[in-house]
């Protein structure tokens, strides 16, 4: 069976891993997934990540917990293959009144809603993380 939405699969693996208190989760690697994971690490939502394998690359995401609770409270897919959600620079969403982040795919790459607003860019809203 082919995977219809690899990003949603990645977010679900992270969500399920944290609800089961796993140390890490593994998933197939792609440039988009790598960019999103890199952004999650930079924003402090995951501890670290590793790329594994030779011909079939996999990403191992090391999950982050604080006092026994997962750092990621919610991680939700917004734009999906069947319904793409695009926002202009003036209409970029804020997550939990600025406490969370929205991950945006812009013409200059994957970035948070704050950085896109600062650069004056709009784009596709990939997901919300809080």
From Swiss-Prot:
SUPFAM superfamilies: Ribosomal protein S8. The keyword Ubl conjugation does not apply. Keywords: Ribonucleoprotein, Ribosomal protein, RNA-binding, rRNA-binding. InterPro entries: Ribosomal_uS8, Ribosomal_uS8_CS, Ribosomal_uS8_sf. This is Small ribosomal subunit protein uS8. GO terms for biological process: translation. Belongs to the universal ribosomal protein uS8 family. GO terms for cellular component: ribonucleoprotein complex; ribosome. Part of the 30S ribosomal subunit. Contacts proteins S5 and S12. PROSITE patterns: RIBOSOMAL_S8 (PS00053). One of the primary rRNA binding proteins, it binds directly to 16S rRNA central domain where it helps coordinate assembly of the platform of the 30S subunit. GO terms for molecular function: rRNA binding; structural constituent of ribosome. It comes from the Bacteria. HAMAP family: Ribosomal_uS8_B (MF_01302_B).
């Amino acid at each position: 069976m082919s995977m219809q939405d690899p990003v949603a699969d990645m977010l679900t693996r992270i969500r399920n891993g944290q609800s089961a208190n796993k140390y890490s989760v593994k998933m197939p690697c792609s440039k988009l997934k790598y960019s999103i994971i890199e952004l999650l690490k930079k924003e402090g939502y995951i501890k670290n990540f590793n790329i594994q394998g030779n011909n079939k690359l996999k990403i191992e995401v090391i999950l982050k917990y604080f006092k026994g609770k997962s750092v990621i409270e919610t991680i939700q897919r917004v734009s999906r293959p069947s319904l793409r959600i695009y926002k202009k620079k003036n209409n970029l969403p804020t997550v939990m009144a600025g406490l969370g982040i929205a991950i945006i795919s812009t013409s200059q790459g994957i970035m948070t809603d704050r950085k896109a607003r600062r650069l004056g860019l709009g784009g596709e809203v990939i997901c919300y993380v809080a």
